[in-house]
Amino acid sequence: MSEKRVQPLARDAMAYVLAGGRGSRLKELTDRRAKPAVYFGGKARIIDFALSNALNSGIRRIGVATQYKAHSLIRHLQRGWDFFRPERNESFDILPASQRVSETQWYEGTADAVYQNIDIIEPYAPEYMVILAGDHIYKMDYEYMLQQHVDSGADVTIGCLEVPRMEATGFGVMHVNEKDEIIDFIEKPADPPGIPGNEGFALASMGIYVFHTKFLMEALRRDAADPTSSRDFGKDIIPYIVEHGKAVAHRFADSCVRSDFEHEPYWRDVGTIDAYWQANIDLTDVVPDLDIYDKSWPIWTYAEITPPAKFVHDDEDRRGSAVSSVVSGDCIISGAALNRSLLFTGVRANSYSRLENAVVLPSVKIGRHAQLSNVVIDHGVVIPEGLIVGEDPELDAKRFRRTESGICLITQSMIDKLDL
């Protein structure tokens, strides 16, 4: 565990991670797992970033709400996040939807996923609640956001990104005054309001909220009693507080964690196949925008004990090699050539195969003479010998999930349907 000094505010906070969503825009990649459980970066899962931020910030009480196809997520959390100790006033609770308030009601929204577990949260008596989305890639020290929340006297503090106005139409957007107090909260506006003094940019919600716990519990109980509510933070809880209380925006630039190699605040919603592929492939750059090698802010995860990667054969046309690539443990590159690709644990790439701009999830087997470019290959897929992907857009679209930008998602069920 990191030796980072635990700050007083973080010690009195509980992080609550919302990890129940499917992430339907990832298509078949989330057929068997929730979006927060999707693999990322060669070793981790998406949820590990929010959890690592909480841990590295000094927060030692964490709850994770799960719902959609949660088995792989729960298994990952049990294996990788079981080091919290009650005798040190630490806790880590996995909170699957379990009809705690009604025999017919699962989690009906993001706010409801917290409300249904009030009886678990309140005995811990945290002074502050940090509500987090479990499906974004970023590094952030929540201690700074907690400090702003206390200093401002806000009822809620909302983490925000500064984005170009015309790129903010897909977000919940904060209309703020000169003190970053939120005047209005607008969900996916056609004409987003600009930031005072910087009108070309807007403040977009990151789905991160800080509350005093007592205030949040009262707000959740009031919302649960409203039959017209959709039980959602963004649609119900936050707009109510903006209208009747005090809401303040916290700018991500003020708390993002950057190493010496990271020049701009890094935050990604990897909710589409294109965005997921791009964020992984970006890690193969000489100096990537996201530094996952920063030892001062480690990304904690469950890591199997595996042998190291191995590259074999050195013939002219059969050389095990990798250029500008990330290759994880237990991979064997047997006479295959990789270029600008990212391989997770346990991949086997056999002789004469070629991979370029490929994101390959764990335990994939690449047959001889396969030629694959601009692909995401799902866990455990067996690529047949001689398969070519990335050269014929029309054929690729018939066989696989091909995006408009030309990225192909390949799953085992798609391979099984091929007429080879």
UniProtKB/Swiss-Prot annotation:
PROSITE patterns, per the entry: ADP_GLC_PYROPHOSPH_1 (PS00808), ADP_GLC_PYROPHOSPH_2 (PS00809), ADP_GLC_PYROPHOSPH_3 (PS00810)
Protein name per its UniProtKB record: Glucose-1-phosphate adenylyltransferase
A Pfam family matched in the record: NTP_transferase
InterPro entries: ADP-Glc_PPase, ADP_Glu_pyroP_CS, GlgC_bac, GlmU/GlgC-like_hexapep, NTP_transferase_dom, Nucleotide-diphossugar_trans, Trimer_LpxA-like_sf
GO MF term list: ATP binding; glucose-1-phosphate adenylyltransferase activity
Assembly with partners or alone: Homotetramer.
UniProt EC number: 2.7.7.27
GO BP annotations, alphabetical order: glycogen biosynthetic process
UniProt organism field: Agrobacterium fabrum (strain C58 / ATCC 33970)
Gene3D superfamilies on file: Hexapeptide repeat proteins, Spore Coat Polysaccharide Biosynthesis Protein SpsA, Chain A
Domain of life: Bacteria
Enzyme class: transferase
The protein's role, per its UniProt record: Involved in the biosynthesis of ADP-glucose, a building block required for the elongation reactions to produce glycogen. Catalyzes the reaction between ATP and alpha-D-glucose 1-phosphate (G1P) to produce pyrophosphate and ADP-Glc.
Assigned protein family: Belongs to the bacterial/plant glucose-1-phosphate adenylyltransferase family.
